[in-house]
């Protein structure tokens, strides 16, 4: 019995090594899972569910194949693929989760999320996030011709890259108070998230209870998977050699 959690793969046609590692994982290990959770930023950038490129279709197909074997797949939108929507879910069979969701893992209650909303000191990003998550703006964007959307996203990507180079690393990490607030709000002792690219397992005390926060790793130089069983959990790496 195993449940897998992954995030921050940043899949893109330019990184075939990441894609190959992901596809191998999906066609092998994932087949044995009780469930697979993707906690955001599966894609480097998802322009919209109307992306019918060969690359996008290959990723869709791997989810279709896995779901058809009976393995449930859950998807949380990240800051780079927040436009993954109901059409993608219907096409692939994945189940879209709320921005912050409470789940049961082998009898243990946990809160799962991408993690960007925990970085409360990054005021500039949170303001940008609030704008692009407005339903009316997404409604308009989704109706723009795809080739125009690609140009818009290319400009946004460039601006994001420039902005990150001038930011302090500290403000791009979570704030402990927000972590505790979310865990208290959802009445859990376990949180799982990605986003920060700082894989680790943190234990701390709050409200006279021991809490655990698991941070998923990114896939920039190697794959990263949280393997959760009824008895234990462990962050594991996967080399880009495709050997599992």
From Swiss-Prot:
Record GO biological process:
lipid A biosynthetic process
GO CC annotation: cytoplasm; extrinsic component of plasma membrane
The lineage, from the top, is: Bacteria, Pseudomonadati, Pseudomonadota, Gammaproteobacteria, Vibrionales
Q: Name one Pfam family in it.
A: Metallophos
What is the protein's species of origin?
Vibrio atlanticus (strain LGP32) (Vibrio splendidus (strain Mel32))
Q: How is the cofactor bound?
A: Binds 2 Mn(2+) ions per subunit in a binuclear metal center.
Which named protein is this? UDP-2,3-diacylglucosamine hydrolase
**Role, per record:** Hydrolyzes the pyrophosphate bond of UDP-2,3-diacylglucosamine to yield 2,3-diacylglucosamine 1-phosphate (lipid X) and UMP by catalyzing the attack of water at the alpha-P atom. Involved in the biosynthesis of lipid A, a phosphorylated glycolipid that anchors the lipopolysaccharide to the outer membrane of the cell.
**Binding-site residues for Mn(2+) 1, renumbered to this chain:** 8, 10, 41, 197
